[in-house]
Amino acid sequence: LYTYSGTTIMKVDKETGLVLKTGTMAGFSSFSINSATYAEGMIFIGLANGRVQAFNAETLESLWVYQDALGGQPNCPIAYADGYIYTGFWNSETKQANFACLSVTDEDATKTNEAKLPTWTYTHNGFYWAGAYVNSDFVLVTTDDGDNGYTTGYGSILSLNPKTGKLID
């Protein structure tokens, strides 16, 4: 079982609740509202200010950190498919934010804090609790409407190419 609080990631025994191992995150996660995501022997956590950090699931050693160009709160669950993770950020009801695709590959195993570059990003009105569905043909994700309050009711449902981020429909 993996969890996190403040700037600490923890591996916890699911039977006893004992903390088996801890690691240090590059920052905190705004409100810690999403669970960590596991894939390919790694743990991925969305951090405040538009960051995602990858950890070795056994050692909890940092592998890389992604810093999104537009920043934002990490309010979206991280989805995994075919060697990539997908997540979105939120800046406010009236500011744009990115939905990002990141390769899970650790390009430089000698560094624990290497700066991860995105495979692609898609900019829209923000992604607030917008968990994505991903398969080999498309990424399906919802967005904010870009207006203050609940006045328009016109958020979007986007279908994106999972390899390029180009809008399909």
Label each residue range with its predicted role.
Residues 1-169:
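Extracytoplasmic/lumenal domain signature
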